[in-house]
Amino acid sequence: MTTENDLLNRIAELETKVAFQEITLEELNQALIHHQLALDKLQTQMRHFAEKLKGAQVSNIASQAEETPPPHY
Protein backbone atom coordinates (compact mmCIF):
# COMPACT_ATOMS: atom_id res chain seq x y z
CA MET A 1 0.00 0.00 0.00
CA THR A 2 2.86 2.34 0.60
CA THR A 3 3.78 2.23 -3.06
CA GLU A 4 0.24 3.07 -4.07
CA ASN A 5 0.15 6.02 -1.65
CA ASP A 6 3.52 7.20 -2.93
CA LEU A 7 2.25 7.08 -6.49
CA LEU A 8 -0.91 8.97 -5.56
CA ASN A 9 1.16 11.61 -3.77
CA ARG A 10 3.47 11.95 -6.77
CA ILE A 11 0.49 12.29 -9.11
CA ALA A 12 -1.05 14.96 -6.87
CA GLU A 13 2.27 16.82 -6.76
CA LEU A 14 2.58 16.67 -10.55
CA GLU A 15 -0.99 17.92 -10.97
CA THR A 16 -0.21 20.83 -8.65
CA LYS A 17 2.92 21.69 -10.62
CA VAL A 18 1.01 21.57 -13.90
CA ALA A 19 -1.67 23.86 -12.47
CA PHE A 20 0.94 26.41 -11.37
CA GLN A 21 2.66 26.18 -14.75
CA GLU A 22 -0.64 26.86 -16.51
CA ILE A 23 -1.17 29.94 -14.35
CA THR A 24 2.37 31.15 -15.00
CA LEU A 25 1.98 30.55 -18.73
CA GLU A 26 -1.22 32.60 -18.80
CA GLU A 27 0.44 35.45 -16.87
CA LEU A 28 3.38 35.44 -19.27
CA ASN A 29 1.00 35.43 -22.21
CA GLN A 30 -0.84 38.46 -20.83
CA ALA A 31 2.46 40.29 -20.26
CA LEU A 32 3.52 39.51 -23.83
CA ILE A 33 0.23 40.84 -25.19
CA HIS A 34 0.64 44.02 -23.12
CA HIS A 35 4.20 44.54 -24.36
CA GLN A 36 3.19 43.95 -27.97
CA LEU A 37 0.41 46.54 -27.70
CA ALA A 38 2.85 49.04 -26.21
CA LEU A 39 5.36 48.30 -28.98
CA ASP A 40 2.70 48.77 -31.66
CA LYS A 41 1.74 52.12 -30.13
CA LEU A 42 5.37 53.28 -30.03
CA GLN A 43 5.93 52.23 -33.64
CA THR A 44 2.84 54.17 -34.72
CA GLN A 45 4.06 57.24 -32.86
CA MET A 46 7.52 56.93 -34.40
CA ARG A 47 6.03 56.69 -37.92
CA HIS A 48 3.90 59.74 -37.18
CA PHE A 49 6.90 61.76 -36.00
CA ALA A 50 8.99 60.62 -38.98
CA GLU A 51 6.25 61.77 -41.36
CA LYS A 52 6.03 65.05 -39.48
CA LEU A 53 9.77 65.60 -39.86
CA LYS A 54 9.67 64.76 -43.57
CA GLY A 55 6.78 67.15 -44.07
CA ALA A 56 8.41 70.01 -42.20
CA GLN A 57 9.18 72.85 -44.58
CA VAL A 58 12.68 74.23 -44.64
CA SER A 59 12.75 77.88 -43.72
CA ASN A 60 13.83 80.28 -46.48
CA ILE A 61 15.21 82.66 -43.86
CA ALA A 62 18.92 82.19 -43.30
CA SER A 63 20.39 82.20 -39.82
CA GLN A 64 22.36 85.20 -38.53
CA ALA A 65 25.66 83.44 -39.23
CA GLU A 66 24.69 82.72 -42.84
CA GLU A 67 23.46 86.23 -43.64
CA THR A 68 25.85 88.49 -45.51
CA PRO A 69 26.31 91.84 -43.83
CA PRO A 70 24.61 94.86 -45.40
CA PRO A 71 26.73 96.83 -47.91
CA HIS A 72 27.35 99.79 -45.57
CA TYR A 73 29.52 97.72 -43.21
Swiss-Prot record:
The lineage of its organism: Bacteria, Pseudomonadati, Pseudomonadota, Gammaproteobacteria, Pasteurellales. Belongs to the SlyX family. It comes from Actinobacillus pleuropneumoniae serotype 5b (strain L20). NCBIfam families: PRK02119.1. It comes from the Bacteria. This is Protein SlyX homolog. InterPro entries: SlyX.
